[in-house]
UniProtKB/Swiss-Prot annotation:
Keywords: Host membrane, Membrane, Transmembrane, Transmembrane helix. It is found in: Host membrane. It is a single-pass membrane protein. The lineage of its organism: Viruses, Monodnaviria, Loebvirae, Hofneiviricota, Faserviricetes. The chain crosses the membrane at residues 55-75. One of its GO terms (cellular component) is membrane. It comes from Pseudomonas phage Pf1. This is Uncharacterized protein ORF83. May play a role in phage assembly.
């Protein structure tokens, strides 16, 4: 199976006297089937390539590195003053 199928979609809508929307024109469109194990990749694709989980991990890593460097610098400064 190639993952490509044709589906019918509504391309034009009209209002009914009862106030509902009804399909006026149908057309065939090509669609891609995505396997369930790829759901995480689809979320990233739909969000424009932005992953909140990855951002959280990256931000925590950068912040952790900054704090570590700050503490090492502070300790080095104290050791220099102690001499």
């Amino acid at each position: 199976m190639s993952g490509v199928v044709a589906v019918q979609v509504c391309t034009a809508w009209t209002s009914t006297p009862e106030g509902f929307m009804a399909c006026r024109e149908l057309a065939w469109q090509q669609a891609y089937l995505i396997p369930p194990e790829a759901a995480g990749y689809v979320d990233i694709l739909v969000n424009g390539g932005f992953s909140p989980e990855a951002f959280g991990i990256g931000a925590a890593g950068v912040l952790g590195s900054f704090v570590t460097g700050l503490l090492i610098g502070w300790v080095a400064s104290l050791l220099r003053k102690a001499k």
